[in-house]
Amino acid sequence: MTDILRRIEAYKREEIAAAKARVPLEELKARAADQSAPRGFHAALAARRDKGEFGLIAEIKKASPSKGLIRPDFDPPELAKAYAAGGAACLSVLTDAPSFQGAPEFLTKAREACPLPALRKDFMFDTYQVFEARAWGADCILLIMASLGDNDARRLEEAAFALGMDVLVEVHDAEEMERALRLSSPLVGINNRNLRTFEVDLAVSERLAAMVSADRLLVGESGVFTHEDCRRLEKSGITTFLVGESLMRKDDVEAATRALLTGSASIMAAE
């Protein structure tokens, strides 16, 4: 685990302990049970793939630790509507506050504003967080293999499946991919960003995609800025992408989303 991830785990453990003190697990489970059924995150992406279309997980992200504030006029419901109108298949919403200025209500309000399934984008370490995610309306959780041991990853995955949620398993290298493929989730995200250096290289996805059989649905994460980037990864069998910052920086998010997916304009090229 990198120093960055160790720091994140430390504050997450403190957050989780405080949350458990505020809302006991049984109360949280009741809140999760009161939610409407998950919308089918994997199913939405698989439907796009099966129609021969690109699938986009469009991210609602206010800030990042490496870039600082990304979008000053940050309105999660309006962004969700723009993404849906532009052709996104799913949402990803940051709920981590210390590093990304995220919040639970961003997820809840974004999902309420559109029909798309939503991922809780956060650092997951405890099954309590899985119940949190469902109570907030999430349809999917993220497991970052760089921050989890195999037993912890399996336990979190099982908790999500028991709630009818999907799981996006994120990897960055071959060792993490091998571990991810021992889990049950068909959704595997390849993060092209090195968490040690923050450098981004699409070749990471191209290398790791060769390790994966057709029964998994691969997601290219980080470094996808243009329709041409999508076409490049398509050659390696990746037709689903998680994109945040490049869309968040655009004035017309709907048009930028459409351009990314269809190549209908050059709006994505100017960063």
Curated annotation (Swiss-Prot):
The keyword Amino-acid biosynthesis applies. Pfam families: IGPS. GO terms for molecular function: indole-3-glycerol-phosphate synthase activity; phosphoribosylanthranilate isomerase activity. InterPro entries: Aldolase_TIM, Indole-3-glycerol_P_synth, Indole-3-glycerol_P_synth_dom, Indole-3-GlycerolPSynthase_CS, RibuloseP-bd_barrel. Its EC number is 4.1.1.48. It catalyses: 1-(2-carboxyphenylamino)-1-deoxy-D-ribulose 5-phosphate + H(+) = (1S,2R)-1-C-(indol-3-yl)glycerol 3-phosphate + CO2 + H2O. Pathway: Amino-acid biosynthesis; L-tryptophan biosynthesis; L-tryptophan from chorismate: step 4/5. It comes from the Bacteria. One of its GO terms (biological process) is L-tryptophan biosynthetic process. Keywords: Amino-acid biosynthesis, Aromatic amino acid biosynthesis, Decarboxylase, Lyase, Tryptophan biosynthesis. Belongs to the TrpC family. This is Indole-3-glycerol phosphate synthase. It comes from Rhizobium meliloti (strain 1021) (Ensifer meliloti).
